[in-house]
Swiss-Prot record:
This is Phosphatidylinositol 5-phosphate 4-kinase type-2 alpha. The gene is Pip4k2a. Its main location: membrane. It is an enzyme of class 2 (transferase). In rod outer segments, activated by light. The modification N-acetylalanine is found at A2. The modification N6-acetyllysine is found at K89, K145. It comes from Rattus norvegicus (Rat). Residues 33-405 form the PIPK domain. One of its GO terms (molecular function) is protein homodimerization activity.
Length: 406
């Protein structure tokens, strides 16, 4: 029988062992990123999801949940100092609300955590007119966008109604799927970021991309933008190229019903200046590129002179992307690629379209009214300028999108 002192030693040993395990688990997640702010985002999301996993899920959200936040300040002198800043702050806005939204959008918190923390987010060369920067999670399922403090305030203004709308439509919407909003502070640099589901696919590459507002004034991509590998083209580019979206009557009806409902909701909130983001996947082009890629890999393996074969390490993030059963070219999982629509059988090319509403946080306030007056003077009252009131904006937007679907 163990003596009291032996029992105490045993308990102490057990506690020590537990602490050691906890320390090792922390070291596995190094949150390596070239930008310290990204390292802090990875750390913060990991910390937040771990904390939320211990909180009981409430039956319903309370008004205070829409004002709540959690924040933590870290003075990090010893642990993982090669990868993490010495001092940083992380703040999460409305954690219970965003957890509920993730659930309603069919996103598991563990999967969300893995996507944002297992490997560093990847920079995206898209840049909004506001100067916002974008990253995608390493598995391309989520988009991380820098936003302004005004955007954070507007998000708080609409969050309760947005959440209610998502509840009523059962998460079936073309609106951005807001999944988390954070403030990061490193060495005196403070940024705000919002995480949304990626409109585009994690596996079907997009070769053409458009940002459409239904306006024709100053709605053409710049020469600098067009020089990019995947430029963001605009309304006049779409019209001048004779581009069309070829979807069948059934998909068209479903899409336009969702779009109309979403846009009416935005008009009620006095929101405007949003866009329809359109991405086009060319099935035959993707197949051809895959064949060429495989041929090149075969040549490289043949020239490697018995060196280690080229491949993905067993524990690398790359292996998580294709854990689901393989899909045929142009096929997709509608639970993951929620914005994807196939072209109809008579389309000139076999394509898959990804379409969703983006950038919904612009409120029609005094500034927008002034901009509208100035542009009306410059371009004339009949010009299709983008700064019109929310009702006009929504009507013109719906008319334009209705005409490009065929």
């Amino acid at each position: 029988m163990a003596t009291p002192s032996n029992l105490g030693s045993s308990v102490l040993a057990s506690k020590t062992k537990t602490k050691k395990k906890h320390f090792v688990a922390q070291k596995v997640k190094l949150f390596r990123a070239s930008d310290p702010l990204l390292s802090v985002l990875m750390w913060g999301v990991n910390h937040s999801i771990n904390e939320l996993s211990h909180v009981q899920i409430p039956v319903m959200l309370m008004p205070d949940d829409f004002k709540a936040y959690s924040k933590i300040k870290v003075d990090n002198h010893l642990f993982n100092k090669e990868n993490m800043p010495s001092h940083f702050k992380f703040k999460e806005y409305c954690p219970m609300v965003f957890r509920n939204l993730r659930e309603r959008f069919g996103i598991d918190d563990q999967d969300f955590q893995n996507s944002l923390t297992r490997s560093a987010p990847l920079p995206n060369d898209s840049q909004a007119r506001s100067g916002a920067r974008f990253h995608t999670s390493y598995d391309k399922r989520y988009v991380i966008k820098t936003i302004t403090s005004e955007d954070v305030a507007e998000m708080h203004n609409i969050l309760k109604k947005y959440h209610q709308y998502i509840v009523e439509c059962h998460g079936v919407t073309l609106l951005p799927q807001f999944l988390g909003m954070y403030r990061l502070n490193v060495d005196g640099v403070e940024i705000y970021v919002i995480v949304t589901r990626n409109v585009f696919s994690h596996r079907l590459s997009v070769y053409r991309k458009y940002d459409l507002k239904g306006s024709t004034v100053a709605r053409e991509a710049s020469d600098k933008e067009k020089a990019k590998e995947l430029p963001t083209l605009k309304d006049n580019d779409f019209i001048n190229e004779g581009q069309k979206i070829y979807i069948d009557d059934s998909n068209k009806k479903i899409f336009l019903e969702k779009l109309k409902k979403d846009v009416e909701f935005l008009a009620q909130l006095k929101l405007m200046d949003y866009s329809l983001l359109v991405g086009i996947h060319d099935v035959e082009r993707a197949e051809q590129e895959e064949v060429e890629c495989e041929e090149n890999e075969g040549e490289e393996e043949g020239e490697s002179d018995g060196a280690h074969p080229i491949g993905t390490p067993p524990d690398s993030p790359g292996n998580t992307l294709n854990s689901s059963p393989p899909l045929a070219p142009g096929e997709f999982d509608p639970n993951i690629d929620v914005y994807a629509i196939k072209c109809h059988e008579n389309a000139p090319r076999k394509e898959v379209y990804f379409m969703a509403i983006i950038d919904i946080l612009t409120h029609y306030d005094a500034k927008k009214k002034a901009a509208h007056a100035a542009k009306t003077v410059k371009h004339g009252a009949g010009a299709e300028i983008s700064t019109v009131n929310p009702e006009q904006y929504s009507k013109r937007f719906l008319d334009f999108i209705g005409h490009i679907l065929t």
